[in-house]
């Protein structure tokens, strides 16, 4: 996709705070998280619910969430029944793929205004058992839907953490190098939180409990005061034979949250006297060997940047999802990226990784970061379980 004479622009962008696993947002149904961000981005964009053409959300762990959770989120936000709403599933890339699909729909003339984003409540993901034909004797094992539908490679039947170990070995990323990436992520996120960098992008979620109504508006997952000495003491989690390097501290978390953006053509924004946050310049997706799925952003970023007519040096800010520190280090190494341009307010190792939401979450953070630092060009990218990568180029001004 190329911007053309009437590019697709992003008018507003917001996200919830990211909750820890079984934490502050764990009791909130996923569609309610979606509803919260949809309402917020419509209000910021000065768009009435009935003016929306379509709602597209990334969502991965749908089991037990009811029929079409995105439709539930859309209707909950006051968008009329006449407006279609649907989910897309591309594992970690779902939330960004939803934005790509929205831009595509607008560029083709099928839609005028689209709300796109992603949502996930990993805390509410159920355990599963297949009992259709009954059980004559013995126990029935329960499968964790987070693992079987979200975090286990379908081709090699091992955890995403093993794919990170494969990347660490192939790209020669040491345990110390991974821990350094993780500490930088935590320290940057701590600084960003204390400086209020996330305040503008976060919409509060009101959570009911026995104690009454609680307002959740601060990312819960970052560990302030993180340091290399403490991090180096953790044992490898996925490989315990003495060769492992990936630990809970240098990997992203399991989390809850939602994010959304409002898109329309530039001329539509002008007619409404709205100032875009950025225009969508290009996007790309790529496939890689599933055993090293974490390097998927390398070809995706190269292709998206080439489509935009940019060089990597032209990019002011990169938001690249930190599924694992090993992956982040390999991508930066392969592309020759300056650490000062990548995840400048911390990444998923510190903030968390709610699967279906992360793609749009990093885009929301990218847009607000570009605005805050006065940057012009940005790239959002994620690796994707199963061996893929997705990237989007956006430009302010």
UniProtKB/Swiss-Prot annotation:
Molecular function via GO: acetyl-CoA C-acetyltransferase activity
Modified-residue entries (N-acetylmethionine), positions: 1
Tagged with keyword Transferase: yes
Pathway listed: Lipid metabolism; fatty acid metabolism
Cellular component annotations (GO), alphabetically ordered: cytoplasm; cytosol; peroxisome
Binding site for CoA: 223, 226, 252
UniProt cross-references to Gene3D superfamilies, sorted A to Z: 3.40.47.10
Residue positions where N6-acetyllysine is found in the record: 200, 233, 235
Keyword entries, A-Z: Acetylation, Acyltransferase, Cytoplasm, Transferase
Active site: 92, 383
Example GO BP: ketone body catabolic process
Subcellular location: Cytoplasm, Cytosol
SUPFAM superfamilies on file: Thiolase-like (SSF53901)
Xref: InterPro entries: Thiolase, Thiolase-like, Thiolase_AS, Thiolase_C, Thiolase_CS, Thiolase_N
EC number(s) from the headed UniProt entry: 2.3.1.9
UniProt keyword Cytoplasm present: yes
Reactions catalysed: 2 acetyl-CoA = acetoacetyl-CoA + CoA
Residues marked Increases nucleophilicity of active site Cys (site): 353
Family statement drawn from the similarity comment of this UniProt entry: Belongs to the thiolase-like superfamily. Thiolase family.
Its job: Involved in the biosynthetic pathway of cholesterol.
Quaternary context: Homotetramer.
Name of this chain's protein: Acetyl-CoA acetyltransferase, cytosolic
Organism: Rattus norvegicus (Rat)
Gene this protein is translated from: Acat2
